[in-house]
Amino acid sequence: MKEMVSSSTFRAPGGLGFLGPSKIGLIPLRNRSGVRSRVKYIAPKCAVSSARPASQPRFIQHKKEAFWFYRFLSIVYDHVINPGHWTEDMRDDALEPAELYHHGLKVVDVGGGTGFTTLGIVKHVDNENVTLLDQSPHQLEKARQKVALNGVNIIEGDAEDLPYPTDTFDRYVSAGSIEYWPDPQRGIREAYRVLKLGGVACLIGPVHPTFWLSRFFADMWMLFPKEEEYIEWFQKAGFQDVKIKRIGPKWYRGVRRHGLIMGCSVTGVKRSSGDSPLQLGPKAEDVEKPVNPFTFIFRFVMGTICASYYVLVPIYMWMKDQIVPKDQPI
């Protein structure tokens, strides 16, 4: 399933989503084999219902509280989350727009966690030219245990405040991280800042579901942006040639209905050197403020319940895929 949206023809709508066909934001559809045959164009459709504003953090969008969530998630991430939401085929497909065509490219993988996405990057780029950054020491410890990542620079850091000078990297990659950011616009602005002139940012993340129950759990749990939100954030940060590529397991025929932790790959090009033209105020989140233990326990339990729903959804979709004819939606 490969579908692309280009900002050259895309204009973010002012309403709640795409309500019908339009000449704006046309997507070329290809067949399942990925071979371009008779091309058909549609307008991208997102949930008509209003999503919870990105400025209102979900249960797992608080860095200090998420620290403990990551600690336990790191134990099962590669074995439980990835098989249903982030397979090797999906990873390689999603990284294709990043144009990792030369082994000498300097690449940063922001929010790289256990290093699953980094494993896809080092297929094309020399390990010593790759940096893996994440805020969770427990996730990074799992990455350090992967022999294939020997030589990769693995460091702890904040996606919204990258510890690098302006114009440092040729490629910026971030997969499965934006949904945890308290301020996604700030993180994408940082992506622009640390890239060199002509650099490409490739951000892989979830999509907002349309089914009411999935939408409820998504908005409670973490950030599931709409496609037009991704494009707006990239363009505001200064990126040009912004494109969206829809991704998902072949058996998961409900990416837009139920959402997916890895549902699209968004790319943009930095056409001017220097800092982003977007100026933002100070961070809204105070990570030094002590966490109320009762609030933390409530949020942690509720966040875990929401996460469990999205662990079960891929299993449900796989079972339906085995039953429902391939030419019918599920």
Swiss-Prot record:
Enzyme Commission number(s): 2.1.1.295
Catalysed transformations (reactions): 2-methyl-6-phytyl-1,4-benzene-1,4-diol + S-adenosyl-L-methionine = 2,3-dimethyl-6-phytylbenzene-1,4-diol + S-adenosyl-L-homocysteine + H(+); 2-methyl-6-(all-trans-nonaprenyl)benzene-1,4-diol + S-adenosyl-L-methionine = plastoquinol-9 + S-adenosyl-L-homocysteine + H(+); 6-geranylgeranyl-2-methylbenzene-1,4-diol + S-adenosyl-L-methionine = 6-geranylgeranyl-2,3-dimethylbenzene-1,4-diol + S-adenosyl-L-homocysteine + H(+)
Subcellular location, record wording: Plastid, Chloroplast inner membrane
Protein encoded by which gene: ARSM2
Region: SAM motif I, residue numbers: 107-116
Gene Ontology terms: biological process: methylation; vitamin E biosynthetic process
Residues annotated as transit peptide in the record: 1-45
Keyword Phosphoprotein part of the UniProt annotation: no
Coarse class of the protein's main subcellular location: plastid
Protein name: 2-methyl-6-phytyl-1,4-hydroquinone methyltransferase 1, chloroplastic
Naturally occurring in which organism (per UniProt): Oryza sativa subsp. japonica (Rice)
Stromal-side segments: 317-330
